[in-house]
Structure formats: structure tokens, C-alpha cells
Amino acid sequence: DARARSFVARAAAEYDLPLVGNKAPDFAAEAVFDQEFINVKLSDYIGKKYVILFFYPLDFTFVCPTEITAFSDRHEEFEKINTEILGVSVDSVFSHLAWVQTERKSGGLGDLKYPLVSDVTKSISKSFGVLIPDQGIALRGLFIIDKEGVIQHSTINNLGIGRSVDETLRTLRALQYVKKPDEVCPAGWKPGEKSMKPDPKGSKEYFAAI
């Protein structure tokens, strides 16, 4: 979509975008979880859990339910590594609830294992730099936020491209692994594979072993 491309091109000039390595913008909002309305505050997770925060354009659309249900179906894998998932769109909690109450075979979500946050004011989408102003919807942004509330990873897809749960998990595990001192992860690293020391000797040892 030309409007989305235009937005991405000028976004850095128009917004004070959150950058990897900086604190994530805090927010408090209503959400739907377990078919109930709840309140969610991002800073409540500080000191407790990593957060996968992902934005999607709209409820009752086409690519979005494939992503949302894919993350829900593998929620236990995120739980095991102390991570919460939060989905966000500009829809109301009433729209979220109706979508959750719609069966998957009819294009709905069914019960989800994580909250869907309502960003009806569009303030959350704007603060994370994913809002397309002239459309009033969010691009497919995904942010991994650590237990200190710092953004460690971000990706933004255009509207028609869904995201990979496998790659999100791989990146999350790598981020948690490099919290160990003096360890970095090479391309495509997965748990159990060899990492490297970020110095001349360590890198030589790594390359000699592959």
C-alpha cells in the first residue's frame, strides 16, 4: 500500500520513535482476556517478565487471525521462558470480545491465552511508531521488551505480511541467552548451538569449530 510506504519513509522525522536499547513507552489500557474486560499496564511487567508486544491492523480481517491464533496456540512455550504476550489494535474492547466469541472456522479467534489490548485513542500505536496516521490503523509492529522494560528487538511488517512465531521465539531465546556476560549469538542461533565470545580470540575459536 503506497500510503503505508509513505508513512514508513517519513516516520522517523514525524515521531520520536522508541529505539532498541531504550525504555519502552509505558501505557495503561483496557483489554480482553478470558472473555472479560481487564486493565493492562505495561510497566506492571517490569522486574517480572519479558513481553512480546505486537500490533495488528484491525479485528475481523484476514492475516490478523492467523497471527493471533498462532501465538495463542504456542503460548505455553513463551510461558516457560517467563514471557507474556500482548496483542494490540485500535479496535474497542467490545470488538475484541465479539471476535474472541466467534469460532475460528468462521474467521474468529476463539478463546485466547493472552490479552488483546484496546488502543481506541491510538496513543499506544503512535508512541511505538506504528500508527499510519491517514488510515488510523497500526502496521504489524512487534517488540520484545525485557524485564527491565527495555526494548531489545523490534520489527515492523507492512499490512499484508504475517509474522513468524518460530522466529519470534528464536530471537527471544537468543536475547535471554546473551544476558549472560561475554556471550553473543551468531546468525540463526538456536538453544543448544554454539555461541561465541565477542573478542578476537573467542571469534577465532568459534569459526575454527564450524
Curated annotation (Swiss-Prot):
GO terms for biological process: cell redox homeostasis; hydrogen peroxide catabolic process; response to oxidative stress. Pfam families: 1-cysPrx_C (PF10417), AhpC-TSA (PF00578). Thiol-specific peroxidase that catalyzes the reduction of hydrogen peroxide and organic hydroperoxides to water and alcohols, respectively. Plays a role in cell protection against oxidative stress by detoxifying peroxides. May be an antioxidant enzyme particularly in the developing shoot and photosynthesizing leaf. GO terms for molecular function: thioredoxin peroxidase activity. Residues 1-10 form a transit peptide. Its EC number is 1.11.1.24. It is an enzyme of class 1 (oxidoreductase). Residues 18-177 form the Thioredoxin domain. Keywords: Antioxidant, Chloroplast, Disulfide bond, Oxidoreductase, Peroxidase, Plastid, Redox-active center, Transit peptide. The active site is at C64 (cysteine sulfenic acid (-soh) intermediate). This is 2-Cys peroxiredoxin BAS1, chloroplastic. It catalyses: a hydroperoxide + [thioredoxin]-dithiol = an alcohol + [thioredoxin]-disulfide + H2O. GO terms for cellular component: chloroplast. It is found in: Plastid, Chloroplast. Its main location: plastid. The active site is a conserved redox-active cysteine residue, the peroxidatic cysteine (C(P)), which makes the nucleophilic attack on the peroxide substrate. The peroxide oxidizes the C(P)-SH to cysteine sulfenic acid (C(P)-SOH), which then reacts with another cysteine residue, the resolving cysteine (C(R)), to form a disulfide bridge. The disulfide is subsequently reduced by an appropriate electron donor to complete the catalytic cycle. In this typical 2-Cys peroxiredoxin, C(R) is provided by the other dimeric subunit to form an intersubunit disulfide. Homodimer; disulfide-linked, upon oxidation. InterPro entries: AhpC/TSA (IPR000866), Peroxiredoxin (IPR050217), Peroxiredoxin_AhpC-typ (IPR024706), Peroxiredoxin_C (IPR019479), Thioredoxin-like_sf (IPR036249), Thioredoxin_domain (IPR013766). Belongs to the peroxiredoxin family. AhpC/Prx1 subfamily. It comes from the Eukaryota.
